[in-house]
């Protein structure tokens, strides 16, 4: 009886952890909203005069920094704890965007602030909701991982629409410290990102030692079911062919999706205007929002599906479906 109480009694409702995870990921998804700024930054008659390749470099720097920092963040997490790591990530992300707003039309300033500093913040914060979530929900790992990272996709919808159209669009209406549109939005977003991550971090705590959800029994790794787990050290993992196969699947799938995220605004405007469509900017803005919405929905859906059919089959189906859709998209835009 005592053991049962120890396993099921928790200091907080575990669903609050999910809420906190979503708040954090809503902010970290800012990188996916970068495309909403590219048209303004590259407008020849505008304030900034960035080239398309310069905006691509800022976006790429953010993604690369995010990916690299995650490796180190995973190692830091057991040492400093989830709350401290999330707070550090949120403050760095917010600082990067605020400084990006203050550096103005400097490409190198944007590269450093939005790309490097902001990307570092995303990398530090991203690992926390996932790691904490699966500890609280060992019975629903796929679903909870999907929910935890869905905010990353949904967040882009919010930031894209706030900047571009909701309430007249912050890019058109905002002025902070007399700064022009893009810079003002960076400052507003930076403060907002930091506050949201700080709020979410308050519930980023690990469950008690030995915690198990009520009525759940850990699967037996020797049973051959997909829920079983085998632990590897980093060195052991790097010696397995499965690691390199899985890494290859992720990198090629991510490259395809991220290329779409970066160029959907500019490419969409060019393609629509080529076909004589006048309101191309509004249409591509809506397309960006729908892309982000289904990005979030897909994370939840595939996470839940993987709990039912297994991780291997789920990722195989995802990659195959993505390939078919990318080929269909190519056909749509060349006809």
Explain the meaning of each model-derived region:
Residues 78-90, 307-320:
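Cytoplasmic membrane-interface "Motif A"-like loop-to-helix N-cap segments
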């Amino acid at each position: 009886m005592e053991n049962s109480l120890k396993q099921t009694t928790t200091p907080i409702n575990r669903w609050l952890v999910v809420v906190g995870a979503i708040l954090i990921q809503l902010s970290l998804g800012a990188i996916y909203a970068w495309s909403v700024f590219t048209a303004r930054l590259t407008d020849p008659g505008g304030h900034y005069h960035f080239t398309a390749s310069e905006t691509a470099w800022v976006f790429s720097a953010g993604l690369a920094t995010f990916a690299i920092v995650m490796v180190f963040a995973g190692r830091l997490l057991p040492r400093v704890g989830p709350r401290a790591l999330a707070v550090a990530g949120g403050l760095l992300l917010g600082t990067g965007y605020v400084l990006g707003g203050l550096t103005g039309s400097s490409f190198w300033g944007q590269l450093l602030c939005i790309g490097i500093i902001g990307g570092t913040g995303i990398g530090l914060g991203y690992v926390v909701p996932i790691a904490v979530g699966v500890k609280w929900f060992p019975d629903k790992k796929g679903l909870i991982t999907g929910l935890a990272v869905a905010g990353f996709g949904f967040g882009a919808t919010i930031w894209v629409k706030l900047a571009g159209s909701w309430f007249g669009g912050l890019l058109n209406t905002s002025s902070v410290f007399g700064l022009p549109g893009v810079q003002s939005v960076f400052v507003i977003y930076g403060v907002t990102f930091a506050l949201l991550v700080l709020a979410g971090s308050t519930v980023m705590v690990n469950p008690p030692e030995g915690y198990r959800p009520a009525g759940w029994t850990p699967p037996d790794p020797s049973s051959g079911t997909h829920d079983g787990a085998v632990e590897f050290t980093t060195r052991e993992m790097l010696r397995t062919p499965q690691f390199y196969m899985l890494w290859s699947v992720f990198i090629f799938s991510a490259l395809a999706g991220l290329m779409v995220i970066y160029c959907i605004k500019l490419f969409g405007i060019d393609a629509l205007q080529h076909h004589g469509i006048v309101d191309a900017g509004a249409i591509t803005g809506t397309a960006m929002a729908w892309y982000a919405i289904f990005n979030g929905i897909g994370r939840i859906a595939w996470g839940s599906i993987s709990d039912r059919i297994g991780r291997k089959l789920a990722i195989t189906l995802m990659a195959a479906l993505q390939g078919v859709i990318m080929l269909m998209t190519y056909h749509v835009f060349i006809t």
